[in-house]
Each structure stands twice: as structure tokens, then as C-alpha cells.
């Protein structure tokens, strides 16, 4: 019998429900239970693909091409697993299916309503995934009380009734503020949030209380009394230095043990040794390197969450802490490359559109001319080709047709299959594709494989008509698409200390114990470069 753990949130958004859900998943997996995580997003968008990163953070891409919420990235990293597009349930998907069924006449003339038709479709989607697992953690996005999440909470309530109380548990994540004036933790917002949840027919089994400092005993007792939750199930999730500490904190607080007992599962000893080692290693790092990320969404760092995490993974493997210098690409256009002075490495991440493109190109030139360890990703890969064409091959005005359709040298062009599309959503080259790597290259030394699968999200590519000229001038295309060798995937400059760019997004497959090879290589090169600089000064 599959066990379900629903994670809801109250008081305010952005409390870390995603990290809490990922941590619960890890605690169950560490006990030897076959576990997966589902994210419910109550927005009406079908998927996260067309959303502005400023509103929603990065769009995470899965192997099957699903463009999903960044929380699924956390689930994949914490559980070291590969999820599918079906693991992200949105209001848009649910309503689409129900409306399609109604049009096909599957409801036989019934009035189609939120209950039972929408709620039934939600339950069907959850159970469809649950078939292969012993434990399923379902995070319901938004805050209790939001109008959008009502059908999902109702579906969860019904599931407890249908599956039996021993098979469905509810964990409610709330916020316990501390008012400076009185210096005590206030439980009233939590009480009201649980009251709201109860009014929907859901009694939480555990409360994860988010706070700046550990939960005081008086606050714990009060929460327990007013929310009808045993004291042992009021979990103190205070702020920690790093998100990877959260599972260990929740385990120490007894959440894993409590949930196994509550769901009538055998309480096995969790195996978290590797995780503990990784966290201890990261916390012990003293040596640092500074890597610049030159992007167009840097005001919201969640826009580049997977890159931040991949750098963290590479920190552990290289025993050096990465400090990120966030640089707005447009600022490079106005203030020049002095903003990059002193960095040990430079990353140009993915992105779309003209804003900040020239600033990114200046940063690429600065990295190339000053031999600073460099990694370009997706749009960063394409702009590296543009920079090289302009400044090495002398192709004045060379550009991507995405930004300048009239460029005299369209070195980056729309892929042929993208030319006649009239829809934006879900139509890019998305998901895991094979990449063939040439032996004897930097890319090969990083991957040690001739064929790898990496995740993509793009419409434009290096124009095959310019490849010969670019290679003649010294640019090496060390990786090509496994399904079409005219499609370039990796480029490098062999005469530089570390200069590489990829059409794919390596950050999406990076894991805490297995950093993405190009990130590992970048941090290693940055560490060596900093040591060299220190010797010469």
C-alpha cells in the first residue's frame, strides 16, 4: 500500500516548503523506502515554460523535456533521482484534461464541476505516479487560504478518506516570527493557519515551524495545544547556513521517525552517512574562489538556482568555497568590464532576448583575452560564437538572428524545425539529447565518455554554414549532437587555461555527490588560477 505525505504551507509564501518536501523525501529514501516527490502548482499556466524568471525563479528542465517549477530541481538533487513532467501537476494541466474529456463526451451529459470532476482528475494524476512507489511526498504550492489551491486541498482531504488514515499524513509548514520589541516567538499566525486548514477538513499530523532561531519550549507547547498536534510532532526548522543541512536538522528533530510511526511503517535506521559527510565537508571549507555570473535576471538569484547549486557541488569536490559575484549584464554595457576585475572565473548563463546581450559579449571577450576560466551555457554558448566571429574572424556585426534578424553574419540561427511554429509553449528543443564528444579534447577529459545525455532548452543553434570558418580560426567544437552531427553542442579554446561553452544546460543534472563535469572543471581551474595569481603577486 502506497503511503502519501502531503505538505502544505501557511502564514506566508517562500518559507521553504520545497526544501522541506525534498528533505522528507530524502529521510524516507534513507530508510530504504522507494520514494518520490510530486509538486502541485495551483497556477493556471500549463507548465512553467513561458513564465518570467523574475516572478517564478528558474525554469527547471527534466529529461523528458518537461519545463517545471524549480522545486523539482530540489527534489532531483536531494533524492538523486530523475523525475518526469507528470511529477508537476498544475491547474492548467488538470483543467485541460477535464475540458478535453468533456468535449469527447466522456462525462455523458453530466454538469462538469470542481467536485467531483476536477478533484477526481487531481487524485488520478497523483495515484498514477504513486503506482511505482512506496512513499509519495506531495507538495501543494501556495498558501492555505489561497483561492487557487482549494481544489487540491479538497482532493488531498478526499484521499485520506479513501486511502485510509494510516496511509495519508499531512505536514503543515508555518512561520513563527519573533518580535524584537517583546523578544518572544509568536504562535498566533500558526494557530490561525491551522484553523484555516481545519476549516477545509484537514487536521495536520505534524507542524514544521520555520523560525530564525530554534523553537522555544513555551512556543512548542502552545502550538501543540492549539493545533491539536503532539509535541513530538511540532518540529523546529530554524534557519541554517545551507539548505543541505535541512534534512539532517529535521531528522534530529524526529520528523522522519514520527512520520514512519504515523504511517504505520517499519522505522528503519536512516542511512544518511554520505549526506552528513558532504554537509560537513562543505561547512569546513575555508579557501575561496570568486566566480562572476553575468546574467539578465541577477536581481532574483533563484533565476539561476541550479547554477548556484552546481557550483556548490563543485565546491565540495574541489575543496574550495565558491563566492558568487552577481553582475547585471546591462551594467557591463554601461560601466565596462572593470566590474569583472579580480574574479577567478566567469559564467555566462542561459537567457533569451536582446537585453544585456552586448554586456555578456563584452564579458566573454574579457575572459578570452585575459585567459580567465570561463563557462558559457546555452545563450552563453551562442554569444561565445558571436564574440569569436566578431573579434577573431573580423565579422563586423555578426550576431544571432534572435537578436538581429538582419545581421550580415548570422553565425547563430533558428533551427530549421523551429521556423514555422505559431506557439511558444513547449515547442523548443527540450529535454535530454545525446551529445557525442571528440576524444583528445577538454570536454572528453572532463566527461571521460564519448556519449553523454544532457538537458536542452533552445530554439537557436550555431549556423552550420560558419562552422568551417570558426574552426579554421582556432575554435574547437568538441561536442556535437548525437542525432545530428551538424548541430554543435560544446565549444572550447585549447590554448586557454579553461574556456568551454555548452549548448545544453549541465547544471540540471548536477548532484551534491556528483557535480556536473564542466562545473567541476571550472571550479578546479578557478582554484588553480587564483593560486597562480597569488604566486605571481
Swiss-Prot record:
Residues 290-532 form the Glutamine amidotransferase type-1 domain. One of its GO terms (biological process) is 'de novo' CTP biosynthetic process. The keyword Magnesium applies. GO terms for molecular function: ATP binding; CTP synthase activity; glutaminase activity; identical protein binding; metal ion binding. L-glutamine binds at residues 54, 351, 379-382, 402, 459. Pathway: Pyrimidine metabolism; CTP biosynthesis via de novo pathway; CTP from UDP: step 2/2. Residues 1-265 are annotated as: Amidoligase domain. Disulfide bonds: none annotated. This is CTP synthase. It comes from Pyrococcus furiosus (strain ATCC 43587 / DSM 3638 / JCM 8422 / Vc1). The lineage of its organism: Archaea, Methanobacteriati, Methanobacteriota, Thermococci, Thermococcales. The gene is pyrG.
Amino acid at each position: 500500500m502506497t503511503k502519501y505525505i502531503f505538505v502544505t504551507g501557511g502564514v506566508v509564501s517562500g518559507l521553504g516548503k520545497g526544501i522541506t518536501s525534498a528533505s522528507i523525501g530524502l529521510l524516507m529514501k534513507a530508510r530504504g523506502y522507494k520514494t518520490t516527490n510530486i509538486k502541485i502548482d495551483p497556477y493556471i499556466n500549463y507548465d512553467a515554460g513561458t513564465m518570467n524568471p523574475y516572478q517564478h525563479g528558474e525554469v527547471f528542465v527534466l529529461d523528458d523535456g518537461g519545463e517545471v517549477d524549480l522545486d523539482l530541481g530540489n527534489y532531483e538533487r536531494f533524492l538523486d533521482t530523475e523525475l518526469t513532467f507528470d511529477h508537476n501537476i498544475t491547474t492548467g494541466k488538470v483543467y485541460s484534461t477535464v475540458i478535453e474529456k468533456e468535449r469527447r463526451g466522456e462525462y455523458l451529459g453530466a454538469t462538469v464541476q470542481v467536485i467531483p470532476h476536477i478533484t477526481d482528475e487531481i487524485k488520478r494524476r497523483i495515484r498514477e505516479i504513486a503506482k511505482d512507489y512506496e512513499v509519495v511526498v506531495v507538495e501543494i504550492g501556495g498558501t492555505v487560504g489561497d483561492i487557487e489551491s482549494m481544489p487540491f486541498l479538497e482532493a488531498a482531504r478526499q484521499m485520506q478518506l479513501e486511502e485510509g488514515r494510516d496511509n495519508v499524513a499531512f505536514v503543515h509548514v508555518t512561520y513563527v516570527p519573533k518580535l524584537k520589541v517583546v523578544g518572544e516567538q509568536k504562535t498566533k499566525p500558526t494557530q490561525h493557519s491551522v484553523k484555516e486548514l481545519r476549516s477545509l477538513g484537514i487536521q495536520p499530523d505534524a507542524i514544521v515551524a520555520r523560525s530564525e532561531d530554534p523553537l522555544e519550549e513555551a512556543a512548542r507547547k502552545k502550538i501543540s495545544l492549539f493545533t491539536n498536534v503532539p509535541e513530538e510532532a511540532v518540529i523546529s526548522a530554524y534557519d541554517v547556513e545551507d539548505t543541505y543541512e535541512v534534512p539532517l536538522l529535521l531528522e534530529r528533530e524526529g520528523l522522519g521517525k514520527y512520520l514512519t510511526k504515523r504511517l504505520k511503517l517499519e522505522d528503519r535506521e536512516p542511512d544518511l552517512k554520505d549526506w552528513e559527510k558532504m554537509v560537513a565537508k562543505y561547512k569546513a571549507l575555508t579557501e575561496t574562489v570568486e566566480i562572476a555570473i553575468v546574467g539578465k535576471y541577477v536581481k532574483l538569484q533563484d533565476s539561476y538556482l541550479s547554477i548556484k547549486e552546481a557550483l556548490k557541488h563543485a565546491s565540495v569536490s574541489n575543496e574550495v568555497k565558491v563566492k558568487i559575484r552577481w553582475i547585471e549584464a546591462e551594467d557591463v554595457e554601461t560601466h565596462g568590464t572593470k566590474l569583472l576585475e579580480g574574479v577567478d572565473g566567469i559564467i555566462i548563463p542561459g537567457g533569451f532576448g536582446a537585453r544585456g546581450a552586448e554586456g555578456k559579449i563584452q564579458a566573454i571577450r574579457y575572459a578570452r583575452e585575459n585567459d580567465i576560466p570561463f563557462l558559457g551555457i546555452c545563450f552563453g554558448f551562442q554569444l561565445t560564437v558571436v564574440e569569436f566571429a566578431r573579434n577573431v574572424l573580423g565579422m563586423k556585426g555578426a550576431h544571432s538572428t534572435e537578436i538581429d534578424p538582419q545581421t550580415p553574419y548570422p553565425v547563430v540561427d533558428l533551427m530549421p524545425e523551429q521556423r514555422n511554429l505559431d506557439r511558444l509553449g513547449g515547442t523548443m528543443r527540450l529535454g535530454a539529447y545525446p551529445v557525442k564528444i571528440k576524444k583528445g579534447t577538454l570536454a572528453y577529459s572532463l566527461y571521460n565518455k564519448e556519449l553523454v545525455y544532457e538537458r536542452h532548452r533552445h530554439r537557436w543553434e550555431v549556423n552550420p554554414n560558419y562552422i568551417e570558418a570558426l574552426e579554421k580560426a582556432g575554435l574547437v567544437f568538441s561536442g556535437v549532437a548525437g542525432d545530428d552531427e551538424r548541430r554543435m553542442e560544446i565549444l572550447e579554446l585549447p590554448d586557454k587555461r579553461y574556456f568551454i561553452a555548452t549548448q545544453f544546460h549541465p547544471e540540471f543534472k548536477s548532484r551534491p555527490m556528483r557535480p556536473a563535469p564542466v562545473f567541476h572543471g571550472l571550479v578546479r581551474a578557478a582554484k588553480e588560477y587564483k593560486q597562480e595569481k597569488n604566486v605571481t603577486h
